[in-house]
Regions:
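Anchoring transmembrane alpha helix of integral membrane proteins
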Residues: 1-47
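Membrane-water interface of transmembrane alpha-helices in multipass transporters/channels
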Residues: 16-23, 61, 176, 213-221, ...
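Membrane-interface alpha-helices at helix entry/exit sites of multi-pass transporters
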Residues: 59-66, 186-190, 285-300, 329-330, ...
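Helix-loop-helix junctions within the multi-pass membrane cores of secondary transporters/permeases
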Residues: 260-343, 396-397, 404-405
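Transmembrane alpha-helical segments and their short flanking loops
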Residues: 313-405
Length: 405
């Protein structure tokens, strides 16, 4: 990653931007595609095996309920930290007013597109996200990485059916999934061997894309710092505390295991793409049982978005400050509730978190046009949010595993 950063800055200095885009960036794209290629079958197979390994419906319901409750609690805590940090620092109070019009014009088209998506979601039934969990066609869902909730639903349904039928009655089917899982893990080994080159390409392309626009970073510097500080509190204080008290792992052990996962999450900005490595590090280096990690981690990829929820809270209050709006305590609570719920209902579409942020803004009366002010710096912050998301997944898996014993 460091070499990718260095090469990116070197390319900027030597005006090699076109070379990076034409000859370096494609390798990063290939690496991302390989990760996404393996993510869906891995979630399906690992979750089915995770359910089957629980051996009993009561174990599944107990662990499932515990997992969801812990995920919701950490999300509420993450949003609260974001609200507290942005309320204390007040980055919106120092945003240069002369840059508002410039940013509004630059990203207006993106805002319009996201607004249309938001309006479509608002017109749907409140239970639409539940409807969307149930696939009409399994193979269609398997061919679309954005349908991860549908894949999880089918995997849980299939796993429960296997338990009810009895694994002893269909040993060849259970053995098939176990052997398929071994093959998938070997494919993951192949992909991870390519990881250094893929990360190098991704970081080089990122620097070339963003280093030239210093204006965005100078205008949004305090806002970005607020987001980073809030995420740092979660990842450096909250998770280690939870891990130490409830997960019974030392901070050193935890971060040694999580570091490669965090690095991959930072470069890919995708929890799903990071899942293969997350499973491997959680099982082998944190000692979490396969039955727990195979269930908790795939579920967490979809519903645990601590970093994203924290970011939404900071962004909403920041925009209110920039636009001169004073939020009441009740509106703060509404942001807390909306951001928490959206962590489960975030759509699996490009810019899905931005669409959900629009709903958060709309719920408290903040003009959604203000979103244009922060879109320019969203990608770097998205990388950091993903680091928090995957770290939270690993933390919760350790807690569930420890409390199961």
């Amino acid at each position: 990653m460091g070499m990718g950063l260095g090469f990116g800055f070197l390319a900027m200095a030597l005006h090699w931007e076109s070379f990076v885009h034409d000859w370096v960036a494609p390798w990063g794209t290939i690496f991302m595609r390989l990760l996404k290629l393996i993510a869906v079958p891995l979630v399906l197979v690992s979750l089915i095996l995770g359910v089957v390994n629980l051996k009993d419906i009561r174990n599944l319901s107990r662990i499932g309920l515990k997992t969801i409750l812990i995920y919701v609690c950490t999300t509420i805590l993450a949003v609260s930290i974001g609200l507290g940090m942005v309320s204390v620092i007040k980055p919106g109070k120092v945003f240069p007013k002369d840059r508002q019009t410039e940013f509004m014009e630059r990203y207006q088209q993106t805002v319009v597109e996201r607004e249309a998506q938001m309006q479509q979601m608002k017109d749907e039934s409140p239970l639409q996200f539940v409807v969307d969990m149930v696939p009409e066609n399994l193979f269609k869902a398997l061919g679309d990485n954005s349908k991860m909730l549908q894949i999880i639903f089918f995997a849980l349904l299939f796993g429960v059916a296997l338990i009810v039928v009895g694994p002893s009655k269909v040993p060849s089917l259970v053995r098939f999934f176990q052997q398929l899982n071994l093959v998938l893990l070997k494919i993951i080994d192949f992909i991870m061997a390519f990881a250094p080159y893929g990360v190098f390409a991704l970081m080089s392309a990122l620097i070339v894309d963003y280093a030239g626009d210093v204006g965005i970073f100078s205008a949004l510097g305090l806002y970005a710092l607020t987001v980073v500080l809030a995420l740092a509190v979660i990842i450096l204080l909250v998770y280690p505390f939870i891990m130490r008290v409830f997960g019974k792992r030392t901070m050193k052990q935890f971060f040694n295991a999580a570091a490669p996962v965090q690095m991959l999450a930072f470069t890919t900005s995708s929890s799903a793409a990071t899942l293969p490595l997350t499973l491997e590090r959680t099982q082998k280096h944190l000692g979490v049982s396969e039955e727990v990690s195979s269930f908790v981690l795939p579920v967490g990829v979809t519903i645990n978005m601590d970093g994203t929820s924290c970011y939404q809270a900071v962004a909403a209050v920041f925009l209110a400050q920039v636009l001169g709006l004073d939020l009441t305590f009740g509106q703060m609570l509404l942001i807390l509730a909306t951001a928490t719920i959206s962590s489960i209902g975030t759509p699996g579409i490009p810019g899905g978190s931005i669409v959900m942020l629009m709903i958060v803004l709309d719920s408290v009366g903040i003009p959604i046009e203000g979103l244009a002010l922060i879109l320019g710096i969203d990608r770097p912050l998205d990388m950091l949010r993903t680091v928090v998301n995957v770290t939270g997944d690993m933390t919760v898996s350790c807690v569930v595993d420890n409390t199961k014993k």
